[in-house]
């Protein structure tokens, strides 16, 4: 596979420009395109108060573009969360404003409200039927690869997330589980705010919650009938 990223408004050309764009990328030899940052405030959820409902006009443009890629034999990949605007209260936390996107990603494995918000948008997108193909995204053979969360690993913003109540609760529960087998495990690190992002104990914690999250997400994707291969290892640099 040899591809390019399309970011933000590049995912929503008018139909005439979409025809030209697809033809040009094919002539250049590309056979894969990543639809990236498509769910920004001006993208697929434009105007949605809850940040979950799909915008009909933006989706029409995206649907047409994707249909043209499929028609030309170009595969598509995307992420189920990159930068979608999410309000704190939309995930059940009584706080004004929006959740920082990296903080939100790190809340998904440890906070039920954040997970359900992720799952609801994923369902809205993947069950959406592209009128230009007649197929739902989950059934699209031209969409064989899906990243569950873009760059969601904990070490990116551990210093910001470790003081949040859901993360502290998850940390305490994890320590209790580990200490049931080894009473001296992570001695002196009951408070996650004392744990550095480079510590071995954080890596162990991160690996455990990541495994549990991905198992849950995979089961959910199977429940929805998703055909694509899945990954949660798009971790940036």
Question: Model regions: which residues?
Answer:
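Active-site mouth of glycoside hydrolases
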Residues: 2-237
């Amino acid at each position: 596979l040899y591809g390019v990223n399309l970011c933000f408004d590049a995912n929503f050309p008018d139909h005439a420009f979409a025809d030209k764009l697809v033809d040009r990328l094919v002539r250049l030899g590309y056979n894969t395109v990543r639809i990236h940052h498509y769910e920004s405030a001006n993208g697929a959820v434009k105007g949605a108060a809850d940040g979950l409902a799909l915008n009909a006009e933006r989706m029409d443009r995206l649907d047409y573009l994707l249909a043209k890629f499929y028609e030309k034999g170009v595969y598509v990949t995307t992420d189920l969360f990159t930068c979608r605007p999410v309000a704190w209260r939309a995930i059940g936390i009584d706080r004004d404003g929006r959740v920082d996107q990296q903080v939100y990603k790190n809340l998904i494995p440890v906070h039920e409200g954040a997970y359900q918000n992720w799952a609801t948008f994923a369902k809205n997108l993947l069950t959406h039927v592209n009128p230009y193909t007649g197929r739902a995204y989950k059934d699209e053979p031209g969409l064989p690869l899906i990243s569950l969360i873009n760059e969601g690993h904990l070490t990116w913003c551990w210093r910001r997330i470790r003081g949040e109540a859901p993360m502290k609760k998850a940390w305490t529960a994890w320590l209790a589980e580990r200490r049931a087998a080894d009473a001296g495990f992570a001695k002196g690190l009951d408070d996650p705010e004392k744990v550095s992002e480079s510590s071995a104990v954080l890596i162990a914690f991160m690996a455990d919650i990541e495994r549990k999250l991905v198992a849950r997400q995979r089961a959910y994707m199977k429940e929805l009938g998703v055909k694509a291969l899945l990954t949660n290892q798009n971790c940036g640099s």
